[in-house]
From Swiss-Prot:
Disulfide bonds: none annotated. [4Fe-4S] cluster 1 binds at C11, C47, C76. Residues 366-425 form the TRAM domain. It catalyses: N(6)-L-threonylcarbamoyladenosine(37) in tRNA + (sulfur carrier)-SH + AH2 + 2 S-adenosyl-L-methionine = 2-methylsulfanyl-N(6)-L-threonylcarbamoyladenosine(37) in tRNA + (sulfur carrier)-H + 5'-deoxyadenosine + L-methionine + A + S-adenosyl-L-homocysteine + 2 H(+). It is an enzyme of class 2 (transferase). Its cofactor is [4Fe-4S] cluster. This is Probable threonylcarbamoyladenosine tRNA methylthiotransferase.
C-alpha cells in the first residue's frame, strides 16, 4: 500500500470529486496524507476554466515529476487541453472516471499508465452513490448536479462535465442528514449552475431548499453559483425558499458583462435588465443580501463603450464582491476563433474594474462597523485568530472562538475583503 496526496484545484464540485477518490483509495488500504512531501503518489485534481490556472497546474505537474513523484492527473484538464499534461505522468482520468482511481494507482505502481477520459455522453456516474473522505471542517460540500444547460461561447468546462444531470432530492437530503449527524454546521450546495438544478427531473432548486431546511438541526446552507437565465424561471419561488433562517442570505449571480450585445456574443441568454430585476427582487426581501457577481473583461468584440457599460452596471448595483476575470481563449470554444483584444487593453480594463470593485466592497463593509451580528465560527485562521462568517456569509476575523459555534460578534473594523470583530460574552 502507498501514501497518496490529493491536490485539488478549482470549484467546490471538483473538491467533492477529490473526496470521493480519497475515500475509494482509503477503503482500498492506501494512506491519504495531507502534505505533498509525504505522498509517494500525487493526484492532481485539475481545473481548466482559465488559461492562467491551466498553466499553473502544468507547471505544478512538472515540478512534482522533477522531484521524483508519481503523478496521476484527474479533473477537467484531460478533457479540455490534454496536450499540456506532461507525458511522464503515471495516469490520466477524466471527471467521469474517478471511480477508476484505485486501478490507476495499481497501474502506476507497476510502472504502467492508465488513461481513461471518456466523453460525458458515453459514461455517467451518480457521484452521490460513492463514499466521501472529507476534512473535519465546519462545512460539507454536497454536489446537487453535474453539467449545465448553457452553451456559453467562452466556456470549455462543459466539454468535461457535459449536459445537466441533476441528482435525486432523496439522495441529496440523505447526504445533508448524514453531514449534520457527523457534526457539520454548514452545507455547501454545489454544481456548475445550481440555478438549473432539477430542470431535467421535474423539480427545481427552491423545492430542494424547502426539503433541506425542513431537516432538524442547527445548520446553515450556502447555495452555490446560479445563472440568471434559469433563476428567472422560478424567481418568486426561490426568494420564498430563501426566507428560511437556515439559508445564508448570499447570492452568487454572475452577470459577466454590462453590455447586452456582449452577453449575446457570450451566449448567456439573458439581458442586463433581467439580471438587475433579479437583484432588485432579492434585495427587496433581503436588504442585507451579500451579492457576488462575475465580470469577464476583454471578451472578443468588447469595445470601450461596452466595457464602460460593465463599469456603470457595477457602480449602479454595487455588489459586495465582483470576481473580475481577464478573458482567455479556451481550446475548442467558439469565442477562441474570434479576433482577440490586445493584452494591454484587457489588463488595463481589469485593473480599473478591480479598483472600482475594491472601493465599493470597502464602502459596503464599513457600514457593518458597530453592528452586532450572529456568526458561525469556522476555525483557526492566520496569526492565531479565528475565521467566522455572518448569516449573509461575510467573512469575519475574531480573536478567539471554537469551531462550529454560533456566537454574537460586534464588528469593530472592516476592509474591502473581511470584517474584524469581537466575540460578545
Amino acid at each position: 500500500m502507498v501514501k497518496i496526496y490529493i491536490e485539488n484545484y478549482g470549484c467546490a464540485r471538483n473538491r467533492a470529486d477529490g473526496e470521493i477518490m480519497a475515500a475509494l483509495l482509503h477503503l482500498a488500504g492506501h494512506e491519504i496524507v495531507y502534505d505533498p512531501d509525504e505522498g509517494e503518489i500525487v493526484v492532481v485534481n485539475s481545473c481548466a476554466v482559465k488559461d492562467p490556472t491551466e498553466r499553473k497546474i502544468a507547471r505544478r505537474i512538472k515540478e512534482l515529476l522533477d522531484s521524483g513523484k508519481k503523478v496521476i492527473v484527474t479533473g477537467c484538464l484531460p478533457h479540455v487541453n490534454p496536450d499540456v499534461i506532461d507525458e511522464r505522468v503515471s495516469g490520466i482520468l477524466g471527471v467521469k472516471s474517478i471511480d477508476r482511481i484505485i486501478q490507476a494507482v495499481e497501474y502506476a505502481l507497476r510502472g504502467e499508465k492508465l488513461i481513461s477520459v471518456p466523453d460525458w455522453r458515453k459514461r455517467n456516474l451518480d457521484k452521490l452513490d460513492f463514499p466521501r473522505l472529507s476534512p473535519r471542517t465546519v462545512y460539507f460540500i454536497v454536489p446537487i448536479a453535474e453539467g449545465c444547460l448553457n452553451a456559453c461561447t467562452y466556456c470549455a468546462t462543459r466539454f468535461a462535465r457535459g449536459v445537466l444531470k441533476s441528482y435525486s432530492p432523496e439522495k441529496i437530503v440523505g447526504w445533508v442528514k448524514w453531514a449534520i449527524k457527523q457534526g457539520y454546521k454548514e452545507i455547501w450546495l454545489s454544481a456548475e449552475d445550481t440555478g438549473c438544478y432539477g430542470f431535467d427531473i421535474g423539480t427545481n432548486l427552491a423545492k430542494l431548499l424547502d426539503e433541506i431546511t425542513a431537516i432538524e438541526g442547527e445548520f446553515r446552507v450556502r447555495v452555490g453559483m446560479m445563472n440568471p437565465n434559469h433563476v428567472l424561471k422560478f424567481l418568486d419561488e426561490l426568494i420564498e425558499a430563501y426566507q428560511d433562517e437556515k439559508i445564508y442570505k448570499f447570492l452568487h449571480l454572475p452577470v459577466q458583462s454590462g453590455d447586452n450585445d456582449i452577453l449575446r456574443r457570450m451566449g448567456r441568454n439573458y439581458t442586463v435588465e433581467e439580471f438587475e430585476e433579479i437583484v432588485k427582487e432579492f434585495r427587496k426581501k433581503f436588504p442585507d443580501l451579500n451579492l457576488h457577481t462575475d465580470i469577464i473583461v476583454g471578451f472578443p468584440g468588447e469595445d470601450d463603450e461596452a466595457f464602460q457599460r460593465s463599469v456603470e452596471l457595477i457602480r449602479r448595483i454595487r455588489p459586495d464582491k465582483v470576481n473580475v476575470s481577464r478573458y482567455s481563449p479556451r481550446p475548442g470554444t467558439i469565442a477562441a476563433k474570434w479576433k482577440q483584444l490586445p493584452g494591454w487593453i484587457v489588463k488595463e480594463r481589469s485593473r480599473l474594474l478591480h479598483r472600482i470593485r475594491l472601493q465599493i466592497s470597502y464602502e459596503i463593509n464599513q457600514k457593518y462597523i458597530g453592528k452586532k451580528v450572529e456568526v458561525l465560527i469556522h476555525g483557526e485562521g492566520k496569526k492565531g485568530n479565528v475565521d467566522a462568517v455572518t448569516m449573509n456569509y461575510k467573512h469575519v476575523i475574531l480573536p478567539f472562538g471554537n469551531s462550529g459555534e454560533f456566537r454574537i460578534a460586534e464588528i469593530k473594523n472592516a476592509t474591502s475583503t473581511y470584517l474584524l470583530g469581537e466575540v460578545m460574552s
